[in-house]
Amino acid sequence: MIDFNRPALVGKELNYIQDAVAQGMLCGDGKYTKLCSEWMKKRFEVNQVFLTTSCTHALEMAAFLSDIQPGDEVIMPSYTFVSTADAFVLRGAKIVFVDIRPDTMNIDENLIEQAITDKTRAIVPVHYAGVACEMNRIMEIAQKYNLKVVEDAAQGVDAYYHGKALGTIGDFGCYSFHETKNFTMGEGGALVFQKNEYQEKAEVLREKGTDRSKFFRGQVDKYRWIDYGSSYLPSEMNAAYLYAQLEECDKINRKRHQVYDGYHERLADLEAQGKLDRPFVPDGCAHNAHMYYIKVKDLATRTRLIAYLRENGIAPAFHYVPLHSSPAGEKFGRFCGEDVYTTKESERLLRLPMFYDLSMDDVDYIAEKIHQFEF
């Protein structure tokens, strides 16, 4: 069976984990946490990086730092992972779902303004598949209405919008380093932002509401509980694994783009014949080859294709069930306007195997089997 995803060792992961153990500090915020943070600051040209235990927790931190209060409204697409909404629901917010663009599967920037009310406090664009939302327009809207922008860049690490790293354009950006992502620490994430005014509060929030970070810098003689907080700091072993992956960022990118381009070239004729749609990347967007998906005629065709590929030793995967159609989505949110594309396009989409060690022979085989399928 060709797996859908397989985490890879690409560099010095095991050596760095051994070194982390030898350092005698495994609890986090040590050598490798700092190395990861400094690497991202330099690579993505961002002032503040806080490594976290997940992108979910990075989103929760962003919701806290955005001062979301009970009854506030937060705008986002329904086609996203539950964590995007959960982080704000935990603060008592009402989620307002907006339809997506069928070409990128991202939030339709032209529908955001009509969803704004006097209760709206934030917009959460989700950069699906590492392809940027139209951030210039979204930032214009946010500035016009004095709204926070929290970028869900879980899939967008080392992807860019007009030269700017995704996650660094809005007020806050949230990354994922889950094992399914381009760069992994097993479970983990990061919160990034440009405004240094949020640094101290973010430190306290990540360290259980204490000034423990100041204590370790020698700025206070003991640390105390001073505000809201939780435990959002990953261990040094996780950070060590991630740092080895970040060091090989360009190597990982080259291989993933090779796989992505391989699919794209081999399936072009099927798109020309009207049998499927391939991913679309707008001008100004530099994607990171996080995933490769195709879109077929309808749900019935996708269901048949999934069964067919599995019979032939290939593990594809569909993706999100739109949040507004779920029980919690109905309870905690509402859909603004008409669901023209969210449900329809989500039912057409199928993700193909994509990981660092996927061979081009496997790409050839997968493309061949898709060609043999009776659309």
Language model: regions and residue ranges:
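PLP-dependent aminotransferase class I/II
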Residues: 34-39, 43-49, 110, 114, ...
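Phosphate-binding glycine-rich loop
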Residues: 26-73, 87-91, 97-99, 164
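N-terminal "arm"/small-domain region of PLP-dependent enzymes with the aminotransferase-like
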Residues: 1-27, 224-226, 353
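Conserved active-site segment immediately N-terminal to the catalytic lysine
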Residues: 151-185, 214-216, 221-226
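Structural detector of well-ordered beta-strand residues that form the stable sheet scaffold
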Residues: 50, 75, 96, 149-150, ...
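Conserved SAM-binding loop
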Residues: 58, 80, 353
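PLP-dependent aminotransferase-like
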Residues: 64-153, 160
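Active-site PLP attachment segment
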Residues: 168-211, 236
